């Protein structure tokens, strides 16, 4: 259920006609599995061997980026998002995947995972909207510091602000109109 590959769809009205289009997000895992015609990688909630064999390494925590949690269309660009990996840039017209993104709307990602839960907030003067998102890299080792970076973009996609931070047990999130 939660491990399915991302599917992006668009519905539009054009001269009184309804159009519908969709496309799977062409992640590496998706394209590899389509070529092999079988599951090759675990998703975040899968257990065992994706091929169904009885033998597997229970300590292998690598999972594929399914790009199935969120989609952001902002400043003329379209991204498919998943909490545990890089966003995938897509063509907003054809919905074809252009590849993993190391930057989003002009902001280079401070860490490779871009959260899939962004917010659109009112700007200071209340006449414009701003997109707010963050990237985070949690460390599993007790003495390593977590890394996080918050980003803001104007309505046209221009980078407006960037705030990197980190530290022991540093976590954060966007709640309604607040940053915690």
Which role fits each region the language model picked out?
Residues 1-180:
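Beta-propeller domains
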